[in-house]
A protein has these predicted regions:
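A short alpha-helix-loop-beta-strand transition element characteristic
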Residues: 328-336
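A conserved beta-strand->alpha-helix junction
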Residues: 221-249, 335-340
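Cofactor-binding loop segments of dinucleotide-utilizing enzymes, especially the Rossmann-like FAD-
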Residues: 179, 203-205, 240
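RNA-binding accessory domains that recognize and position tRNA/RNA substrates
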Residues: 1-175, 185-233, 349-352, 378-399
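The feature marks non-catalytic terminal segments
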Residues: 335-339, 343-399
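General small-molecule cofactor/ligand-binding pocket signal
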Residues: 136, 236-238, 309
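Active-site adenylate/phosphate-handling loop in enzymes that bind or generate adenylated species
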Residues: 121-126, 159-171, 232, 241-327, ...
Length: 399
């Protein structure tokens, strides 16, 4: 049994469209896992039937737009039928002294006692089977969920949390800057959670980056693909080492990081039309490093005339790490990810005119054009990686 959240708030035509896309994404995920199934869509739920319900539930719990998933037992909608199934579950889990609650809901028009009375009846069944247990609706140790519908009933005692959000692919596409670090993959995941199709862009700094940097970025990209199974998730890899070579010779060192970020944004903006992307997404966080002061973020953003979305801008580092651990992109031993171009004293309030003058000194426009000519594409599908040169005019949108 699949529950979705804020889709209820949409108008009926939009809700039908979004539910259709959610079902499409569930199908792709289950097909990728090799699980056979069929589905139904009663009001407010998606029911999935299959011979491996727990495996199905585990896969569906990673689909964006799903709030939670339960392995449910189908029965009739009378108190007696619901009580027999609930009692069988209770006998497996309820012990003397344990606090429990029954969460019952009866659909209008299904007949029988209302939700509150149905909960009391089922609670009585559980107490008869385990007299030492006690009802506690506020802080239960065990819960049984009852849904009585017009055409039958469902009983379950566990809800597997899912990411929530909106179905992947309902909110257009964005180009996300993804590195080997912690923040950028979390930012991309959060955009996926809100229904946005993502194309990733990685800047390969070559000898200017730590030896584990390139592989770390690909690994982050690969792990993110496990959240959108059935979709080829693409990452454009740009050789940015010529930029660092040029900056090392002719740019005030204090502006290195700001110019680097502006370069990334300008490359992204050039690539956006071909990817049908409508925004740039970054893992930037207010005040975390020198380039992320409000002053420098403004200077960096001024390099482009497209929307720039920073999902993590207000998050503490500990909060970002917690999300990275939960979604599987946190690496306990990341290896050497150092940037060898970071100056000892980077500017925290870059002067825009001076930055533009420095860019002109090294002909950033030419560097951008040359970088785009050397793009490689890394495609991740269900956690499997393929690397190839980008064919001319190839679309890299995942949806």
């Amino acid at each position: 049994m699949v529950r979705y959240g804020e889709l209820f708030l949409k108008s009926e035509p939009v809700k039908r469209h979004f539910i259709g896309l959610l079902i499409r994404n569930i199908k792709r995920s289950l097909d990728a896992a090799g699980l056979s199934f069929r589905h139904e869509t009663p009001r407010g739920r998606i029911l999935i039937y299959g011979e491996e319900p727990r495996k199905i539930a585990a896969e569906v719990a990673r689909v964006f737009g799903v709030v939670d998933v339960s392995v449910a037992t189908i029965t009739g909608n009378t108190p007696e039928e619901l009580g027999r199934v609930a009692g069988a579950l209770g006998k497996k889990h309820l012990t003397a002294g344990m606090r429990f609650a029954v969460r019952a809901k009866r659909e209008k028009g299904s007949g029988g006692p209302d939700s509150q009375e149905l909960g009391r009846v089922i609670g009585g069944v559980l107490l008869d089977d385990q007299p030492g247990a006690r009802v506690d609706l506020s802080h239960p140790e065990y819960e049984v969920f009852i849904e009585a519908r017009e055409n039958g009933g469902f009983v379950y005692d566990h809800r597997i949390p899912a990411p929530g959000g909106l179905p992947f692919g309902t909110q257009g596409n964005a180009l996300g800057l993804v590195s080997a670090g912690i923040d950028s993959p979390v930012a991309s995941w959060m955009m996926m959670k809100r229904g946005c199709g993502m194309v990733h862009l990685n800047m390969d700094a070559g000898r200017w980056a730590g030896c584990a940097t390139a592989a770390g970025a690909v690994e982050n990209h690969r792990r993110l693909s496990l959240w959108v199974k059935g979709y080829p998730l693409r990452m454009l890899v740009v050789d940015s080492s010529p930029l660092y070579d040029a900056m090392s010779k002719g740019v005030p060192q204090r502006y290195t990081c700001v110019i680097c970020k502006r370069f990334m944004f300008r490359v992204a903006a050039k690539l956006m039309p071909g990817e049908h992307a409508e925004a740039i997404v970054t893992g930037e966080n207010l005040g975390q490093v020198a380039s992320q002061t409000l002053s420098n973020l403004a200077v960096i953003s001024s390099a482009v005339n497209v929307p720039v979305i920073r999902p993590l801008v207000t998050y503490d580092k500990a909060e970002i790490v917690a999300i990275a651990r939960r979604i599987g992109t946190f690496n306990q031993k990341p290896g050497d990810l150092c940037c060898r171009a970071v100056p000892a004293m980077p500017s925290t309030a870059a002067n825009l005119a001076e930055v533009i003058a420095a860019e002109e000194m090294i002909d950033v426009d030419l560097l951008i054009a040359e970088a785009i000519e050397r793009i490689r594409v890394v495609t991740a599908l269900n956690g499997e990686i393929t690397v190839h040169e980008k064919p001319e005019h190839e679309q890299t949108s995942p949806v």
